[in-house]
Amino acid sequence: MLDIKLFREQADTVKSKIELRGDDPKVVDEVLELDNERRQLIGKTEEMKARRNKVSEEIAEKKRNKENADDVIKEMRELGDEIKENDAKLNEVDNKVRDILIRIPNLIAEDVPQGDSDEENVEVKKWGTPREFDFEPKAHWDLVEELKMADFERAAKISGARFVYLTKDGALLERALMNYMLTKHTTQHGYTEMMTPQLVNADTMFGTGQLPKFEEDLFKVEKEGLYTIPTAEVPLTNFYRDEIIQPGVLPEKFTAQTACFRSEAGSAGRDTRGLIRLHQFDKVEMVRIEKPEDSWDALEDMTQNAEAILEELGLPYRRVILCTGDIGFSASKTYDLEVWLPSYDNYKEISSCSNCTDFQARRANIRFKRDAASKPELAHTLNGSGLAVGRTFAAIVENYQNADGSITIPEALVPFMGGKTEIRPVND
C-alpha cells in the first residue's frame, strides 16, 4: 500500500507511475478529493470538541453559581450528536480512501523498462548455451510417463486437470531438488530455513497483496475462512506482521519449501501439458526483510542466489527485467530467470525475484528500530523463487535426456539422489 503523503506531495509522480502500469491515473484525484474532505471533517470535529470542552466548563461554572444551565446543557447534547455524526462521516471517508489505496499497485522503480506485455521485458544476462541434440528430443511430459516418473492420468481421476502424481524416480528427483536447493541456500547463501503454515487467513493474504485484488487466483476453505498459499512468500513475509523488529535483527533471510496452490484463472489453454502450470506444485522460496537503504543490493544478491542453483545444475538460462506492463502488483522491480526448455524451443520462467520496497510492509505493518531510542520505520521486503521445483524438474529431464530414453542426473544432485547418476527406462 502506498503512503497517502505521496499523493499529497508528489501527485504528478504517482499519476505517471500508475499510468505506466496501464492503470487510470484519475484515481489519484479521487484520493486527494477524499483526503481533503477527510481533513475538513477532522478540522470541524476538533472545533466542535473544543467548543464542547468550553461548554462543559460553562455548565460547571453555572452549577457552582447555582444558575440555570439548561441552555448550555442542550448545546452540549447537540454538540455530542454532531460529533458522533461527523465521526461516522469521517469513518465512511476513511474507508473509501483505504478501499482505493489497497487496490493501487506499488510505484515502479526508475530503471524498470516501459512496455505493455512480457514481449517487452528486457534481457540483461544470458548464461549457458542450449544443447544441440543429435537426436529428436522429447518433451518432459512424454519422458516422465515413459520412465514411470509421473502419472497425469491417475491424478486427473483423483483431482482433475493440472495435477500430477510423481512416482518412483520422479518422486526421488523432486525430493532431491528440494533438499539440494534448501541446503544450498542455508549453508552457502545464509538463509534460515522455515517450515510454514500452508493455510493462512485473509489478513495475511492482504499483507502481501494477494487480497483483495487477486482473490480469484486463490483457493479458499470457505468454512474456516482460510486460503491455501500460492507461494511461501505469503507466510514468510508475514512472519513479522504487526510487529516492531528490534535493533540488530535485520537483515532477515528466510527460505522455505512448500506446496503452492493456484487456480490459474485466466490461463485456460496455456501450458496445458506437463509440469509447467499446475494447480499444486512445489517451490523453494527466499524472502528477505531489509533496511530501506539495503534493499536494492539485496535484490541483486537474492537473484544471484537463484542463478547459482541454475548454474550448478548446468541449466542454460537468461535474466530479464520485467517491463511496466508485466510487473506484479506488489513489486517495484522484478527480475525473472527463464530456463531453456527444448520442448518449447524457448526460455520459460523458473524464478521471479522482486523488491517490494515498503509496499507490503505498510500493508502488513512490519516495522523495525535502528536503535533503542529511534522511532519505528517501515522495513523493505523482497521475495524470490529459489527455485520453482517442478519447472526445474522439467528442465533437467529435457536438457539431460539421452538418445536411449534415459536421463543423466546433474553432478550436483547425485548426493541427494542416493548416489544415483541416471534414470533409465524401467525395462532396462
From Swiss-Prot:
HAMAP family: Ser_tRNA_synth_type1. GO terms for cellular component: cytoplasm. It comes from the Bacteria. It comes from Staphylococcus haemolyticus (strain JCSC1435). It is found in: Cytoplasm. GO terms for biological process: selenocysteine biosynthetic process; seryl-tRNA aminoacylation. The lineage of its organism: Bacteria, Bacillati, Bacillota, Bacilli, Bacillales. CDD domains: SerRS_core. It catalyses: tRNA(Ser) + L-serine + ATP = L-seryl-tRNA(Ser) + AMP + diphosphate + H(+); tRNA(Sec) + L-serine + ATP = L-seryl-tRNA(Sec) + AMP + diphosphate + H(+). This is Serine--tRNA ligase. Homodimer. The tRNA molecule binds across the dimer. Its EC number is 6.1.1.11. L-serine binds at residues 231-233, 285, 385. ATP binds at residues 262-264, 349-352. One of its GO terms (molecular function) is ATP binding. Pathway: Aminoacyl-tRNA biosynthesis; selenocysteinyl-tRNA(Sec) biosynthesis; L-seryl-tRNA(Sec) from L-serine and tRNA(Sec): step 1/1. NCBIfam families: serS. Consists of two distinct domains, a catalytic core and a N-terminal extension that is involved in tRNA binding.
